[in-house]
Amino acid sequence: LLEAILHKDNFNRAYKRVKANKGAPGIDGMTIEEALPYLKEHQQEITDRIYRGKYTPSPVRRVEIPKPDGGVRKLGIPTVIDRTLQQAITQKLVPIYEPLFADGSYGYRPNRSAKDAILKVKEYAEQGYTFAVVLDLSKYFDTLNHEILINLLRKNVKDERVVQSVSYTHLRA
């Protein structure tokens, strides 16, 4: 699986996806446009370090985004290089895990939007359902037990190198 993740075509598609998202630079200050020549020059070195288990993501850049209620949402922005690697991993894990998710789940899933979720709620209302629960769990990701997540990942991903890469690139952000 790691070979498929790091394959040039998958990595290039990942970069294009990161570029399309137009995100801000990470802690290194490298923009999306600056990352392309860097990746072209250093992709082999990066992939070699990943294969050897020696790749360490950069620290995330911490920012606070104002919320409508006056509070702030704290975000960690990875570097463009790390986001590209995260996207490359995601592109290969989504086909494995997408079929396992509940049909009524819409958050952070491909080809599902907030509008789709609203249409589903409308459908439930038309079927006679009259109650709904709205939740916004404070600091939810920060409170997840990452060991449980990694063990769930191991059930379907037998390549331990991928499990370790996910642990470093996704769960430390």
Predicted features along the sequence, with ranges:
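Non-catalytic, polymerase-adjacent accessory regions of viral genome-replication enzymes
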Residues: L1-K40
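Short, conserved non-catalytic motifs in the polymerase core
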Residues: A20-E34, P57-T84, L100-S113, V133
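Conserved catalytic palm subdomain of right-hand nucleotidyl-transferase polymerases, strongest
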Residues: A24-I27, T31, G76, K115-L153
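A residue-level signal for conserved active-site and pocket-lining positions in enzyme catalytic cores
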Residues: G26, I65, I89, V121, ...
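Amphipathic alpha-helical blocks
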Residues: E34-T56
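Hydrophobic (often cysteine-bearing) scaffold residues that line and stabilize catalytic clefts
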Residues: Y38-L39, I77, I81-L85, L93, ...
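Active-site palm subdomain of RNA-directed nucleic acid polymerases
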Residues: T90-A102, T130-F131
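Conserved small/polar residues in nucleotide/adenosyl-binding loops
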Residues: T169-A173
